[in-house]
């Protein structure tokens, strides 16, 4: 789960001697918003497509645009979630990875981050989703786990989020069974507010609904 484990080796890097035109060409070819600028393995910063497009002279070299570079980067030995934070903060489709000496290791793409997040969240595991709402003091992971296990289920992934304006605490559970109606009923019996659930019952209902819509369309 470290950033160095998810570096994309195919991402190009720019030099200070590269022109605006060449940089834009690479950005378009690789469909990214930024590219790293490197000098003798040292990371100098990210240059954005927006800043490049603002230049009237495509023959201008990147040496003259250093004041626009995003100099932030993430370290190679930290958790990948820091890369997600970087991407959101800078609205960048590339996250540069460096060591303590700012030596450039490579970049993580947002498309790769999405796949990593999917694995991290258990998105590829078959199961059901239950979303609970509660006051923060009501949250007890031990009690939630007990109710899940009492219904012969296991938690694949658990995520929490707080609405800072209301103080409401949201808990999203991904469990290993699709038939979750008994588990939902168990939460409701224990006075949990079940905001949303998605299991085999809803999946089958959606299939039936889509089939009926298709039949109506074919009858037109």
Label every PLM stretch briefly.
Residues 52, 101, 105-120:
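Short, structured interface segments
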Residues 127-220:
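A conserved regulatory-domain signal marking ACT and ACT-like small-molecule sensing domains
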Residues 85-88, 115-118, 146-149:
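A broadly conserved amphipathic alpha-helix scaffold signal in soluble, globular proteins
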Residues 28-31:
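N-terminal, positively charged regions that mediate nucleic acid binding
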Residues 33, 93, 154:
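Short acidic/polar active-site loop segments enriched in Thr and Asp
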Residues 1-26, 37-39, 43-48, 57-88, ...:
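Bateman/CBS regulatory modules and CBS-like beta-alpha motifs in cytosolic regions of diverse proteins
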